[in-house]
Amino acid sequence: MHLKKYLLKGLHRLQKGPGYTYKELLVWYCDNTNTHGPKRIICEGPKKKAMWFVLTLLFTSLVCWQWGLFIKTYLNWEVSVSLSIGFKTMDFPAVTICNASPFQYSKVQHLLKDLDALMEAVLGRILGPELSQVNATTALNLSIWHHTPLVFINEQNPHHPVVLDLFEDNFNGSASSSPAPGRPCSARRCKVAMRLCSHNGTTCTFRNFSSATQAVTEWYTLQATNIFAQVPNQELVAMGYPAERLILACLFGAEPCNYRNFTPIFHPDYGNCYIFNWGMTEKALPSANPGTEFGLKLILDMGQEDYVPFLTSTAGARLMLHEQRSYPFIKEEGIYAMAGMETSIGVLVDKLQRKGEPYSQCTKNGSDVPIQNLYSSYNTTYSIQACIRSCFQEHMIRECGCGHYLYPLPDKRKYCNNQEFPDWAHCYSALRISMAQRETCIYACKESCKLLGTSPPLPPCLLPPVSPQDWIFHVLSQERDQSSNITLSRKGIVKLNIYFQEFNYRTIEESAANNIVWLLSNLGGQFGFWMGGSVLCLIEFGEIIIDFVWITIIKLVALAKSVRGPPPTVAELVEAHTNFGFQPDSAMPGPDAGAYRREQNPPIPGTPPPNYDSLRLQPLDVIESDSEGDAI
């Protein structure tokens, strides 16, 4: 009951309004505010009123302008960067090592036999008929060649370039690999390009190269990708270099280690790779001292004699230092350690800590990125490299109908190959150079808020070439092959030293350049300096604004009521106060009814009764209390 009464009073108060006009509110505000200036407008003479009005308006505008600048600066979400450097006990970084050759040629030769024979014929044609050693009667598998051939482009006439196939009689369907003698074009006078066709050869494009070496390498890699994409992953792993053959010796600090301390992982570009101190199943190993004696020492055998001849142009190891539980994108971020060299890597860990939203578009774990992370099956942390490659594979599947061999596959999808997807090479080439695809993926992917990097390695040193040092290779040969003879070639050995430098960490951390405290301090400083105001002055101004809005709403409601219908007439008001349901009491029948005179009813008033409450000089509750006192 009390709540209903309270709410009813509140409703009546809202309907009544402040009880002032606009002018009265302004005069009240100027007379009572603590802000300097407004009070002088109503207390001075006409000239001073005008002067103080102009000054107050000027300084108010100046304060608003300064406030706008500070708010704009704050909303730019600028950051300041702090740099700290030193040495402390840290987890030793994960080290991924791979052989530059992804497979052992002795195990993949049966898969690449036709491709290698065709490659030799191509090289013979490019080198020229006089240098070609290709047997003219050798039969080749020209299905590979017809699908994606290499061509000469003669641009002696730029307006009418001539496209010439490397094998002239291949146009007639002949299986002969003999180059046409006396062809008017060679690699010295013409450009070598790759012809990519789709829709049964009706739509073709040419991918040009500045060097015949690049053209042949790209062509061979594309054909090898088609072959390996059709081989099960278990067979590919068996064709790579096993850990016990690759890793000859291992030492971490004062503790010996071996290939069992490395986690195997298959990389499409480099075959079997091995990760030391990955931290997936075991705790990461720390390092508390700088120098080579407290780092990781490795001796690797590259097995250079078993390299795939046309697939690999570098002899050595590919390695990468990265954070624990992160996927090694070794092709993009790795470095080479050349065979026959000793390479030392002094590690300086760079840690970058970015501010999140709204200061930057970084992500903490990739959950807010709209791209499916295809590398999540490795149980690794998010990285922008993983996102960009997942995005490319997504576009590849959508545009070409199949996935590329170099990237993980989503469920229920297949890798591209010439048999099932004959147009995939043309589609892949177009997608690879598409700027729209790149911009889409770069826009969708976000950088990680935490990044870790390492410093570049020191220049490599040659391994000892003199004969007194052959005992090293004798011992290594005995340990690996149980042979008293040297079975390891000095040219195929890689020695690595990975250790912390004297300063092993460098932290780059972002912090907010302008926080909310900075903003409020500057806003209050400007308001106090130019107008002598404070937060309470702003509350007073807010109060007057609320009253203005209140009065305006009441006026609008009254205007709406007057528009909907005319005001009630006097007759309607009288009718409203007339009680037509009133009937006089009839006399009760009785023996002495005639003895009494019939009581006359008073006439019904034709005007509404007066509002007697308005005639009282005191409130109703005061009168009632006085009457109660008299009664007592």
UniProtKB/Swiss-Prot annotation:
Annotated catalysed reactions: Na(+)(in) = Na(+)(out)
Subcellular localization: Apical cell membrane; Cytoplasmic vesicle membrane
GO biological process, one term: multicellular organismal-level water homeostasis
Regulation of its function: Originally identified and characterized by its inhibition by the diuretic drug amiloride.
Membrane topology, as annotated: Multi-pass membrane protein
Disulphide bonds in the chain: 98-273, 185-190, 197-204, 250-257, 362-449, 387-445, 391-441, 400-427, 402-416
Listed InterPro entries: ENaC, ENaC_chordates, ENaC_CS
Function: This is one of the three pore-forming subunits of the heterotrimeric epithelial sodium channel (ENaC), a critical regulator of sodium balance and fluid homeostasis. ENaC operates in epithelial tissues, where it mediates the electrodiffusion of sodium ions from extracellular fluid through the apical membrane of cells, with water following osmotically. It plays a key role in maintaining sodium homeostasis through electrogenic sodium reabsorption in the kidneys. Additionally, ENaC is essential for airway surface liquid homeostasis, which is crucial for proper mucus clearance.
Family, per entry: Belongs to the amiloride-sensitive sodium channel (TC 1.A.6) family. SCNN1B subfamily.
Name this protein carries in UniProt: Epithelial sodium channel subunit beta
Organism of origin: Ovis aries (Sheep)
Protein encoded by which gene: SCNN1B
